Amino acid sequence: MIVDGVHSHPASIALAYRLKGNQSCYLITDAMRAKGMPEGHYDLGGQDVIVKGSEARLSSGALAGSILKMNEGLKNLIQFTGDTIEHLWRVTSLNQAMTLGIDDVKGSIKIGKDADIVIIDDACNVETTIKNGKYHAFK
């Protein structure tokens, strides 16, 4: 699910999560390269994309893609579903790793798995990332 409140209404996301649960939902971003950039005009495959607020649209008004960051998607999912991060974390990583058949090394924290970890604060802001066990300061 692209949980930006633009691609899908918050009530639709809450319904899908209630019906499917945390073991069957996947949080994705489908983000284009304008993600994290200021409002303005960007190119997407030769098409002019206008980024304003949390939306990326073509000049026709059609959605051009997402500019959602994963941590913002998680924050939205918490808000839209009323569930906790203790239940929702797996929709950001483990479910995807299981589908790809790489959950033996990715998707959760366990001895023997790759240490790819994003540390967030209570407001879902990224504080630190760890990639292959190496610390990368975010701020």
Predicted regions and their residues:
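Active-site-adjacent C-terminal substructures of enzyme catalytic domains
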Residues: 1-92, 98-103, 120-125
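C-terminal cap of metal-dependent C-N hydrolases
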Residues: 98, 108-139
